[in-house]
């Protein structure tokens, strides 16, 4: 819909009348409208949703993508996400040589599902990034990597679980402090 807030907001970005766009709307719709209005960068075949999450390293945060745009990915999508995430970390988060990790169920090179096992050696040979290997879920919030890449299925689960745990801990602390 041409008069929807998403369409209007993204058109303002395209016309350089706005620097960015935030929405509380459906992420799938936001992606679709973004692709139609803004298009994709050269070499990018799939957009990704990224988010900044807190961690215990000296920076206090890391960037994770994809957290929900693409539930099924091919290895080249993950490589593109790694390059985009690294560029974002450099330009926006001001990290000179951001480390890039691949979300997996173990830190060893041979761990993971078929996608993870297939993309690992490709990321290892990608000169455009500082690949540091697999990052396990238990290590995410330690900040072992400045950028963590995965498909949108795994990323969305990791994001939603972390949000749920944060809400749970907050409610328990609030209950204990107020009782």
Model-derived segments and their meaning:
Residues 35-60, 64, 144-179:
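Glycine-rich phosphate/nucleotide-binding loop
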Residues 4, 11, 18-21, 28-29, ...:
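Structural motif
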Residues 11, 38, 50-55, 69, ...:
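A generic local secondary-structure boundary/capping motif
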Residues 26-29, 36, 107-108, 153-156:
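Short glycine-rich anion-binding loops that position phosphate/pyrophosphate groups of nucleotides
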């Amino acid at each position: 819909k041409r008069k929807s807030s998403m369409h209007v907001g993204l058109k303002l970005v395209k016309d350089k009348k706005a620097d960015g766009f935030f929405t509380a709307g459906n992420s799938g719709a936001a992606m679709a409208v973004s692709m139609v209005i803004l298009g994709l960068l050269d070499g990018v075949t799939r957009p990704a949703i990224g988010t900044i999450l807190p961690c215990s390293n000296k920076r206090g945060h890391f960037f994770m993508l994809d957290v929900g745009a693409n539930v099924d990915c091919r290895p080249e999508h993950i490589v593109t996400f790694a390059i985009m995430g690294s560029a974002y970390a450099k330009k926006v988060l001001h990290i000179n040589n951001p480390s890039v990790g691949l979300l997996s169920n173990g830190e060893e090179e041979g761990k993971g599902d078929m996608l993870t096992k297939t993309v690992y050696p490709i990321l290892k040979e990608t000169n455009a990034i500082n690949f540091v290997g697999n990052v396990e879920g238990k290590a995410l919030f330690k900040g072992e990597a400045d950028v963590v890449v995965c498909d949108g299925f795994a990323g969305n689960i990791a994001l939603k679980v972390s949000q749920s745990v944060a809400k749970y801990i907050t409610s328990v602390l609030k209950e204990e402090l107020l009782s």
